[in-house]
Amino acid sequence: MAQKLWEKSVEVNKDIERFTVGRDREMDLYLAKHDVLGSMAHITMLESIGLLTKEELAQLLTELKDIYASAERGEFVIEEGVEDVHSQVELMLTRRLGDVGKKIHSGRSRNDQVLLDLKLFTRTQIREVAEAVEQLFHVLIRQSERYKNVLMPGYTHLQIAMPSSFGLWFGAYAESLVDDMLFLQAAFKMCNKNPLGSAAGYGSSFPLNRTMTTELLGFDSLNYNVVYAQMGRGKMERNVAFALATLAGTISKLAFDACMFNSQNFGFVKLPDECTTGSSIMPHKKNPDVFELTRAKCNKLQSLPQQIMMIANNLPSGYFRDLQIIKEVFLPAFQELKDCLQMTTYIMNEIKVNEHILDDDKYLFIFSVEEVNRLAREGMPFRDAYKKVGLDIEAGHFSHDKQVHHTHEGSIGNLCNDEISALMQRTIEGFNFQGMEQAEKTLLGRK
């Protein structure tokens, strides 16, 4: 059985070991590739300060690239009796290279190692989330342009209120994603700082070159203060979780709208038949399960920041094992959000809209404000116009040609989709993912 990195002469009670390891072996599979990348940067730095020879570095890099490839193929496993990904990688290197494999932990603690793994994993996942958001954004903008002249009711208090349009509806969610991406970008910038070299949270007596590992891994900067680097555990995950929750909030609201508008009582949109499910008893049913599940999953994601805060709340500075539990709720959250984004993108691209909603006379009164404004433009004081139209409605005399004349920025007749698209493009460029991508390729010896 593999020896633990911290093992001494006393054997730990097996029940205690099982409880303390928990789901770490399962969760650390998310981090395997990133742990290897971090080790590659670390040993390159160790060679530069004389703690490894060039030959030892070459041997280690060869084996680490092989381990990385196995993780890419989904073949990397954490063996029974091995606590975590860090221990597994070191064990594999020691088996292959003997004492040389035991040198990779010099100047490093599992504390800064897992901090690094989490940051490398998280920034990669943020990039994938951003790509998925961008795809949904473009679908929404296309649909907004396609249906910009199709009117629909706007609601306040779930009562018919004023004319809206599908151009506004699709475009509103597109612009919401821009603000969500700004939040995600801020979380990315806080995440994209190098904690490596902080060791257990108090640095090392080795002359570590932290700037070198920062550059090798493509970080924007580093967490300078080693105590703060460790304090960032839990804080980074919480900040990112807030960004994910913000995105999830937008998708949840869109899913609610789609479910409601798809119902026969509204009949504003129609989901593709292949995207609905049936009933075991009612043969006519076409249920929007995909959006109901999206809504539930996104609502669950919105609880993620609170879960993380409750785990990390009231911890003093320094490392505590409580932080391990955050991985269980944090690491899987990215895939859940990406799944929701993918499904929403697909269905929003295929959804059909009812182009004759306002032909129904029950929506006539949504044009009341249009009539008030017409009278005001003709010179009648607004309050008098408001009163006249109200009395006409009560008397059953109200009529309108069901035309709207909105021209200001962001209105039915002037959606400003080009401006919204430009905002999204600038936001995407602000992430600057190229630096991290190129650094990782260089470490792996890939073009």
Curated annotation (Swiss-Prot):
Record's keyword annotation contains Glycosyltransferase: no
PANTHER family: ARGININOSUCCINATE LYASE (PTHR43814:SF1)
Top-level EC class as recorded in UniProt: lyase
GO terms under cellular component: cytosol
Keyword Zinc-finger: no
Catalysed transformations (reactions): 2-(N(omega)-L-arginino)succinate = fumarate + L-arginine
PROSITE patterns the record matches: FUMARATE_LYASES (PS00163)
EC annotation from Swiss-Prot or TrEMBL: 4.3.2.1
Gene Ontology biological-process annotations: arginine biosynthetic process via ornithine; L-arginine biosynthetic process
Domain of life the protein comes from: Bacteria
Signal peptide: none
Protein name in the entry: Argininosuccinate lyase
Pathway: Amino-acid biosynthesis; L-arginine biosynthesis; L-arginine from L-ornithine and carbamoyl phosphate: step 3/3
Compartmental location: Cytoplasm
Single GO molecular function: argininosuccinate lyase activity
Family indicated by similarity: Belongs to the lyase 1 family. Argininosuccinate lyase subfamily.
Family matches, as NCBIfam families: argH
Keyword list, A-Z: Amino-acid biosynthesis, Arginine biosynthesis, Cytoplasm, Lyase
Major place of residence: cytoplasm
